[in-house]
């Protein structure tokens, strides 16, 4: 019998690797262009995750930060980056095993609305009993409100839930509310 009824997963760097260099490399050819793109597309990523920045406005602003020859690269990045997170197969296997053993599984992840709209690109998403992405609800980890939103929306008890995230501050926030976790 499982100790926890619910296992909550972050997406980036838990379910799939979010490797900036790998992803950016899909949208440009030179190290110099990669660095130009990085500074342009990630300048307000935290606000995109929080849902406090408009995605299309961010694209337009990012274009002002790079030479004109990279404008199409910026647009292409913002429209397609979600396709280049690399699945972490061990975690996908764990998710399926947990489901087979009767656990409920959830996603709690900071992510732009664009990713929330395209997360089903990853077939593993179909396995989840519930999903909370930050931007659509204008909340983000590690603020307690997003954890409460998860608990309330899916009627979860924190003490019956276990959280897997790649950031210590997110685990600590869950623990402060009674949900055990692992980095």
Residue ranges and their predicted role:
Residues 48-92:
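Metal-dependent phosphoesterase signature
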Residues 10-13, 51, 98, 107, ...:
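Generic structural signal for small/hydrophobic residues in well-ordered secondary structure
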Residues 89-136:
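Substrate-recognition/cap helix-loop segment adjacent to the acidic, metal-dependent catalytic center
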Residues 6, 140-168:
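Conserved Lys-Pro-Asp/Glu-containing loop-to-beta segment of HAD-superfamily phosphomonoesterases
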Residues 92-100, 151, 171, 175:
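Surface-exposed amphipathic alpha-helices with a cationic face
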Residues 6, 75-106, 144:
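Short, acidic loop-to-helix structural element flanking the phosphoryl-transfer center
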Residues 1-40, 69, 176:
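Active-site neighborhood of HAD-like aspartate-dependent phosphohydrolases
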Residues 25-28, 32-65:
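Alpha-helical substrate-recognition element adjacent to the catalytic core
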